[in-house]
């Protein structure tokens, strides 16, 4: 904030010495100076009223008429104005929208956007009472941003009339400064408190506000300066001998802190002070300048980056943590949270630092409370809050209420509810004095366990189709408490019986856990009984359970017990081995069946190939049948340019063309088609081949080249059509479309740019629709050198802010779905999943602004009907793809090394063509007989499809008789 009026002329010179500022920072500085001038007049007027005419206003550069300018400025800034509508229809429309928003909030009170829209409309309509209530309701649920608080404060200041209203505004300021660290709100608070200096205790109130503001944001490198100067401005306006020392003290405190514009502050102090500046102050000032140089790189990184600047703040936090100043660490965390309030990990790190280092009750609990208000969907924040309240001795009733709020927070996973219940049950267990046989706390703990099991079964299973606790961890903990702390093994056994009936009886580790509990707190009889049941039920590791049973009987059992145990284990293991053998035989049969099918397919392909070869020999004039027609995957309706229409008419003479009619569809309409004679077609194909020279791939240009695929095969002149698209990314050197031997476009090409940044920008055009198909754009990579290189632009892990929607009608458009999703939050991105032909698959991914909106959307949209289709909505969490195992070679008996058949990450592909040499696929056969002599080894009989059967003398005789 600016200095006194007489030093305002030196501001430009001081500003030139300041550190670098971004454009936004310069605007803030200008705004701060404007507020400082208003503050000067407000301070002068208030001091005049307090001290009377004895104070010389002209000496301080303030006129008497400026006394009420602060109130006028505040009113002009914040007054919403009187909106006059030209049409009553618009006002009625706003009223209907207000009613709709109120109804929506009655259904879902956690809809942040609805609160904001309702406040905006009520303020627009001038409903001051209703807008105040709406703001209060929102502030109880969510922390408000600096803009929302300033708007609310300005409205309340403009309506304040007397001292009672001023106290109400003070209370509002106190709430505002608790949500986030806001230098502008503290500045407004100080300015407003100056206006009440004439009231009883007004002077002490102003100083208290400014001192608290300095404690909160006085260390702020870029915005703390305004508060220091505002405080000095206030003290300088009160001309008393005792106050001069106060101004000296403020100057010395400020100069000892590394802040921007320190040189200007030092120059101002030299000009203001009549005495020489003490040496200790100069030393502290020089030390602060040195510290400023260390902080400048981090501050400059923040100024140059764009919000939310999480990475820059993380680096700044790490730097402050190394230095270890608690005040500065707290400040940088608060600054980071202003822009990253929806990042749970940042809240967790901040609260963890406070829990372990500062341990100040009010500060710790305040941060935990703000954390759950900002990220209510994060169960870790709620669990940490319960622990912090217990750690600082908060009343049990308050902790219970907080836990009930956590259950209504809307967690996005079933396991989150298990975690919060476990945290609360741990707290209740620590309250119980188990030395007493019965107590109120113990009964409350047992009731909580019972309620937890019912809640997971009814509420959680109904919502997520799973309890979130398949291993029954809560019941296991309850059983341990009953057995170890309450000496109630009967209850523990009942709980374990219930655990086993929930699908856990087949797991050896569950039985061994129960056995260990019986071993520690039960008796041998129940241990033996548990192991006998385990032997009969376990299916994953029966050998281990059998070994434990035999070990127990060996050390504690009688001969009869030993015989029974041996008999049961042998019977069980024999049955298990029999089942395993049957399963292995079944699997081997399936493998053999697959191999037989593969052999049949192979034989059929060989027969087909031999037949084509025979036809080719018989009719050399016909077109080669072994040329494959390239068919687009998933696009059965698109006609390929390589296909020829059969024409029943005779072939015209050479050099002529004939106009024939070809049936165009079931309607019976015919279309005239010009058919060229074969000679011209051959000439045209030959010319196409001559016009398309082969270009060797230059791997040195891979960085400036992109590979474009999935283009329509029917695309005419790909270069002409694709060049305008890619020239938007930068200068295109050439486009190399790939054609077949017949001159047909094969659906992919290479685009070479002049600069590498253009190629990187072109990758953003991936999935862009071209002639109705999604165009794939990927980096140009030599697959022979990088066989594992894959490009997938979307995340394959859990994304809590993104939804996966299935069951959509194929006719649903992106705009229609976006309109539905917008009702539940801000949609950042929406993607309809299509196949290669561009046709929808009934799936979509919707990305929301934060996890809270996504969680609410799941609850509201799951099971919704869209165009008679019931959709399913869930948090995006794609299943893990199977990673192919590393191939290993195996050697066939008496043959060469064999390579096992391997598949990609998605399993078998559509094209089951083996690209391995035949010599590696089966035992090598002897080479066929050479042209000039016999082979080195006897030939192995080839399949019947590829070699004619051997004929006897009788067969040859029959052939001669036929003639």
UniProtKB/Swiss-Prot annotation:
Stretches of the chain forming a coiled coil according to its record: 21-46, 82-110, 559-619
Positions of modified residues (N-acetylalanine): 2
Domain RRM: 704-782, 801-878
Residue segments, region Disordered: 1-36, 50-90, 590-694, 878-898, 920-948
GO molecular function terms listed in the Swiss-Prot or TrEMBL record: histone binding; protein-macromolecule adaptor activity; RNA binding; U4 snRNA binding; U6 snRNA binding; U6atac snRNA binding; ubiquitin-specific protease binding
Keywords: Acetylation, Coiled coil, Cytoplasm, Methylation, mRNA processing, mRNA splicing, Nucleus, Phosphoprotein, Repeat, RNA-binding
Signal peptide start and end residues: none
A biological process term (GO) from this entry: spliceosomal snRNP assembly
Compositionally skewed regions (Acidic residues) per UniProt: 57-69, 626-639
Annotated stretches, region: Required for interaction with USP4: 487-520
Ranges occupied by HAT repeats: 126-158, 164-195, 201-237, 242-275, 324-356, 359-391, 394-430, 487-520
Predominant location category: nucleus
UniProt-annotated stretches for the region Necessary and sufficient for U6 snRNA binding: 537-953
Gene Ontology CC entries for this record: ASAP complex; Cajal body; cytoplasm; nuclear speck; nucleoplasm; nucleus
Motif (Nuclear localization signal): 601-608
Residue(s) carrying Phosphothreonine: 657
Phosphoserine: residues bearing it: 10, 16, 215, 650, 769, 795, 852
Compartments (UniProt record): Nucleus, Nucleoplasm; Nucleus, Cajal body; Nucleus speckle; Cytoplasm
Subunit structure of this chain's protein: Component of the 7SK snRNP complex at least composed of P-TEFb (composed of CDK9 and CCNT1/cyclin-T1), HEXIM1, HEXIM2, BCDIN3, SART3 proteins and 7SK and U6 snRNAs. Interacts with AGO1 and AGO2. Interacts with PRPF3 and USP4; the interaction with PRPF3 is direct and recruits USP4 to its substrate PRPF3. Interacts with USP15; the interaction is direct. Interacts with HIV-1 Tat.
Entry protein name: Spliceosome associated factor 3, U4/U6 recycling protein
UniProt gene name: SART3
């Amino acid at each position: 904030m600016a200095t006194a009026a007489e030093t305002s002329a030196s501001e430009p010179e001081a500003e030139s010495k300041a550190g670098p500022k971004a454009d936004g920072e310069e605007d803030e500085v200008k705004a701060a100076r404007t507020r400082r001038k208003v503050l000067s007049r407000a301070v002068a007027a208030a001091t005049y009223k307090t001290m009377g005419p004895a104070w010389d206003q002209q000496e301080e550069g303030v006129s008497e008429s400026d006394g009420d300018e602060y109130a006028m400025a505040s009113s002009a800034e914040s007054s919403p104005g009187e909106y006059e509508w030209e049409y009553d229809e618009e006002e009625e429309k706003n009223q209907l929208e207000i009613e709709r928003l109120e109804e929506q909030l009655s259904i879902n009170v956690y809809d942040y956007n609805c609160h904001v829209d309702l406040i905006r409309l009520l303020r627009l309509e001038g409903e001051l009472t209703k807008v105040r209530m709406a703001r209060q309701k929102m502030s109880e649920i969510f922390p408000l941003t600096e803009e929302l608080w300033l708007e609310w404060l300005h409205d309340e200041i403009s309506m304040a009339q007397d001292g009672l209203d001023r106290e109400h505004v003070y209370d509002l300021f106190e709430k505002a400064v608790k949500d986030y660290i806001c230098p502008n709100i503290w500045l407004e608070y100080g300015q407003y408190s100056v206006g009440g200096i004439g009231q009883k205790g007004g002077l002490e109130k102003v100083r208290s506000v400014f001192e608290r503001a300095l404690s909160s944001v006085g260390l702020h490198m870029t915005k703390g300066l305004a508060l220091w100067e505002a405080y000095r401005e206030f003290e300088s306006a009160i001309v008393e001998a005792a106050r001069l020392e106060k101004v000296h003290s403020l100057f010395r405190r400020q100069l000892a802190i590394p802040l921007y514009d320190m040189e200007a502050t030092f120059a101002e102090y030299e000009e203001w002070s009549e005495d020489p500046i003490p040496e200790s102050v100069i030393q502290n000032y020089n030390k602060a300048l040195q510290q400023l140089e260390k902080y400048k790189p981090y501050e400059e990184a923040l100024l140059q980056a764009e919000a939310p600047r999480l990475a820059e703040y993380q680096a700044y936090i790490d730097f402050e943590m190394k230095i270890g100043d608690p005040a500065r660490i707290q400040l940088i965390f608060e600054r980071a949270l202003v822009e990253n309030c929806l990042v749970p990990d940042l809240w967790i790190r901040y609260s963890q630092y406070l829990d372990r280092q500062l341990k100040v009750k009010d500060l710790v609990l305040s941060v935990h409370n703000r954390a759950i208000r900002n990220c209510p969907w994060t169960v870790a924040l709620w669990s940490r809050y319960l622990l912090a309240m217990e750690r600082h001795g908060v009343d049990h009733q308050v902790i219970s209420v907080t836990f009930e709020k956590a259950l209504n927070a809307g967690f996005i996973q079933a396991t989150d509810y298990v975690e919060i219940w476990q945290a609360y049950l741990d707290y209740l267990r620590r309250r119980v004095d188990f030395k007493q046989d019965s107590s109120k706390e113990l009964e409350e703990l047992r009731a909580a366990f019972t309620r937890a099991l019912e809640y997971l079964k009814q509420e959680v299973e109904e919502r997520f189709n799973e309890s979130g606790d398949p291993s029954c961890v809560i019941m296991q903990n309850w059983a341990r408490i009953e057995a170890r702390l309450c000496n109630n093994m009967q209850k523990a056994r009942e709980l374990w019986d219930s655990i086993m009936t929930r699908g856990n009886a087949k797991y050896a580790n569950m039985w061994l856990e129960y056995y260990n509990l019986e071993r520690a707190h039960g008796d041998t009889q129940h241990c033996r009984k548990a192991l006998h049941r385990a032997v009969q039920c376990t299916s994953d590791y029966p050998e281990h359970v059998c070994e434990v049973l035999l070990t127990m009987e060996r050390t504690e059992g009688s001969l009869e017990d030993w015989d029974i145990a041996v008999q049961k284990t042998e019977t069980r293991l024999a049955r298990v081995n029999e089942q395993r053998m049957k399963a292995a035989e079944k699997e081997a049969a399936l493998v053999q069946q697959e191999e037989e099918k593969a052999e049949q397919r192979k034989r059929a392909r060989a027969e087909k190939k031999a037949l084509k070869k025979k036809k080719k020999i018989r009719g050399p004039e016909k077109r080669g049948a072994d040329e494959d027609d390239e068919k687009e995957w998933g696009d059965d309706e698109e006609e390929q340019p390589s296909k020829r229409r059969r024409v029943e008419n005779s072939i015209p003479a050479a050099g002529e063309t004939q106009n024939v009619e070809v049936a165009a569809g079931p309607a019976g309409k015919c279309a005239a088609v010009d058919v060229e004679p074969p000679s011209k077609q051959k000439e045209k194909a030959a010319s196409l081949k001559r016009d398309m020279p082969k270009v060797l791939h230059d791997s040195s240009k891979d960085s400036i080249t992109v590979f474009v695929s999935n283009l329509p095969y029917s695309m005419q002149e790909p270069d002409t059509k694709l060049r305008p698209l890619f020239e938007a990314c930068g200068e295109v050197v050439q486009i190399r479309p790939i054609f077949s031997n017949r001159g047909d476009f094969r659906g992919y090409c290479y685009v070479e740019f002049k600069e590498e940044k253009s190629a990187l920008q072109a990758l953003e055009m991936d999935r862009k629709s071209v002639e109705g198909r999604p165009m794939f754009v990927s980096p140009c990579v030599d697959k022979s050198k990088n066989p594992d290189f894959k490009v997938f632009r979307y995340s394959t892990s859990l994304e809590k802010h993104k939804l996966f929607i299935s069951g959509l009608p194929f006719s649903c458009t992106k705009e229609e779905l976006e309109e539905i999703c917008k009702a539940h939050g801000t949609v950042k991105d929406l993607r309809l999943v299509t196949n290669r032909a561009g046709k929808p698959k009934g799936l979509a991914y919707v990305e929301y602004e934060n996890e809270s909106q996504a969680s609410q959307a799941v609850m509201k949209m799951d099971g919704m009907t869209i165009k008679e289709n019931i959709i399913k909505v869930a948090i995006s969490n794609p299943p893990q793809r199977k990673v192919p195992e590393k191939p290993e070679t195996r050697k066939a008996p008496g043959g060469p090394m064999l390579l096992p058949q391997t598949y990609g990450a998605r399993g078998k592909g559509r094209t089951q063509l083996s690209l391995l040499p035949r010599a590696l696929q089966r035992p090598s056969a002897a080479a066929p007989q050479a042209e000039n002599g016999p082979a080195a080894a006897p030939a192995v009989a080839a399949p019947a499809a590829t070699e004619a059967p051997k004929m006897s003398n009788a067969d040859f005789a029959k052939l001669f008789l036929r003639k």
